[in-house]
């Protein structure tokens, strides 16, 4: 019962914040809870969902290349400016933080609740995008390591 109330609460907050992605996500999860074999579906989504999401984002990023909006010369030209180098460095940093984040979430599932709450607050009340839980966990991991805080 608690999970239903929690999900409905997230749905209401998403509605109030007019966040379409979170509205759809909460409706889908609530709907899946109604399906008799959701106990088989949720572990699969929990394990593979992020990979599927990253794949969809990767496909979206590659579409401009497929349509010809971005060509090889655009890639070459991106290395001719400080902005391009900064973008490449940030891409590398985010991928490394995300890698640490996935491991951190697996090793410390209790952190997931806090990250989800932070993501919801950022998405609903600050017009953020819910692409950040993995990166957020990577940043949290980095800060925890820098501060030498022991993880349970």
UniProtKB/Swiss-Prot annotation:
Bilayer-spanning residue ranges: 4-24, 52-72, 85-105, 115-135
Organism, as annotated: Pediococcus pentosaceus (strain ATCC 25745 / CCUG 21536 / LMG 10740 / 183-1w)
Membrane topology according to the record: Multi-pass membrane protein
Alphabetized Pfam families for the sequence: DUF441 (PF04284)
PANTHER family: UPF0756 MEMBRANE PROTEIN YEAL (PTHR38452:SF1)
Taxonomic placement: Bacteria, Bacillati, Bacillota, Bacilli, Lactobacillales
Cysteines paired by S-S bonds: none
Domain of life: Bacteria
Cellular component, GO, one term: plasma membrane
Entry annotated with the keyword Transmembrane helix: yes
Protein name in the entry: UPF0756 membrane protein PEPE_1090
Compartments where found: Cell membrane
Keyword Membrane set for record: yes
Keywords from the named record: Cell membrane, Membrane, Transmembrane, Transmembrane helix
Similarity-based family: Belongs to the UPF0756 family.
Family annotation (InterPro entries): UPF0756_TM
